[in-house]
Amino acid sequence: MDLIKTFKNVENSNNYYIIEFNESLVAIDPPRDAWKVLNYSSFLSKPISHVLETHIHNDYLTGAFEILNIHNSIHVVPEPLKTSNFELADSTFAINVEGYTITSLPTPGHTFTHVSYLLQKEGKVLAVFSGGSVTSNGVGRTDLISPEYTSALTHHQFESKNKFHEFEDSVYVYPTHGQGSFCGVTNKPLPDYPTIESLKTDNALFIENDYITFEQNLISSLGAYPSYFGSTNDFNLGDFELISNIEIPKVTTDTEVFEGLILIDATVDKNFKVQNAIKIPNNNKFSSYVGWVINNKTPIAIVFEDKDIHDFNIKNLFNESEESQLASDKISQTLLALYRVGIEKIKYIIPQSSVKKLKTNTITKETYRGEKFYDIREHNEKTSKEEFSFDTLSRHFYKNHSLPSEFLNLKENYLSCGSGLRAGLISSIINDDKTIFLNDSSVDSLN
C-alpha cells in the first residue's frame, strides 16, 4: 500500500513500519536504533504522533524510547510499562486520522498480550499489522515465554490466526517477524507482505483448520533460538537506556588492554582465527550468534578487519551523519545490531593487523580422509545428540563462560554442522589445536 513505508532489519530478519498520513506519521514496532524512522520523519517534516507496539519483544529492544526522546509521541503498548508515558492497546483503543482509523485486535499466541493493529477506512479493513501473530509463511513461535506456557499459547495462536480468516482476501498483512527470524515458525519462503488471499493459498499453518494437526506442525517446527531472548523484556517494559548514553568502544592496537575480556574474532576469513578468540564472522546473523554465547553483562572486545576500522565513524552510531555514510560503515552497523539486542559492553575495537592469527584446522571435501565427526547441528537433525547440540553448548557457555566437561572429554575431536559457522564457533571456544571443524559443506556431502 502506498500509505505504508516498510523498513527492514536484516540482522534480525524483522520488519517495522510507518503509516504516512498528510500531516503526521505512525510508527509500528521500531527497533532500538530507530534512525530510519526519525530520518524519514525529518525528511518529510512530519511529526510521529504514535508509536504502536504489537507485543513486548523477546528478540530486540524497542526504538520507542529513542523516538519519544525527540517527538511528543503517544506510546501504545499491549501491557503496562514501568514508565508513565504510554497508552494501553485495549478494546477501546482507536486512532482517527484524516478519515482513517487504527484499532487494536487481541491476537495472543506469540505472547499472552499480543495485539495486531487494523488500518481501516470507512469501516473497511485495508491492512493488518500482525506482529508475531500471522507471518508471511507461518505464525509466530509460541515457546518464548516459558515451556510450561507453550501449549496454552499454541492454542491461543490457533484461535488468533483464525480471526484473520474473517478479513477480505484483498487485505494486506504486514508482519513484524520476517523470513529467517528466530521468532517465526515457517514452512517455505513467500512474499514478505502477503494478502489474506495468498495466505489462504501458501501458508500451511494459516490454512490448517484442525487444531491437533496445527499444534503438531507448529511444535515440530520450533528450532533453537539465541540465548539472549527474554533478556530484552525489562528494557522494553521501561528500564531503558538511550544509545547516546552507551559507552562507545575505543579503537586500540594495544593487545594487553583486552586481557580478562572475552575476545570476538569478527573477521570473515574462515581459514584463520585470532588466537584465544571466539570466531564469529561478521555476517548478517553476527549479533544473533554473539547473543547466543555472550551474556549482555559480559565485557567483550571485537577484532575487525583493518579496512572496516578505516570506515568507522562514531557519529554514525548517534544518527549525526548522513544515512549514506552509515551504509558504508560496517562497524557502526554491527555495533547498532549488537545494541539492538542489548549487547552494550563492547570495550575495545581491535584491528586485525595488530593481533596474532592462527590457521584454523578445517576439512573440506578435497581434504576429507574419512575422519569421524561429531555433528553439533540442532537436535531435530538426524546426526546430532540433543545434549551436545550447538544450542545446548552455546547456552552453557552463555551462563558459565565454559563448555560442559563431558563435551570437552569426548574422544571425537572433529566437529561439523551445515555451513561450518556453528562448528567453527564451538571449535574456537575449545581452542584446541587438535579440534578440526568442517567449514564448507555438511558431513553428508563428503561421502
Q: Across the structure, where does each feature detected by a protein language model lie?
A:
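Active-site neighborhood of phospho(di)ester-bond hydrolases with catalytic His/Asp-centered motifs
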Residues: 27-29, 47-57, 75-79, 106-109, ...
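Divalent-metal (often Zn2+) His-rich catalytic cores of metallo-beta-lactamase-fold enzymes
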Residues: 155-245
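Active-site metal-binding loops of divalent metal-dependent hydrolases
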Residues: 30-31, 56, 110-111, 131-134, ...
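Active-site metal-binding motif and surrounding structural segment of the metallo-beta-lactamase
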Residues: 32-77
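Conserved beta-strand hairpin/beta-sheet module of binuclear metal-dependent hydrolase folds
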Residues: 1-47, 117-131, 137
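Core dinuclear metal-dependent hydrolase active-site scaffold
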Residues: 2-4, 17-20, 94-123, 166, ...
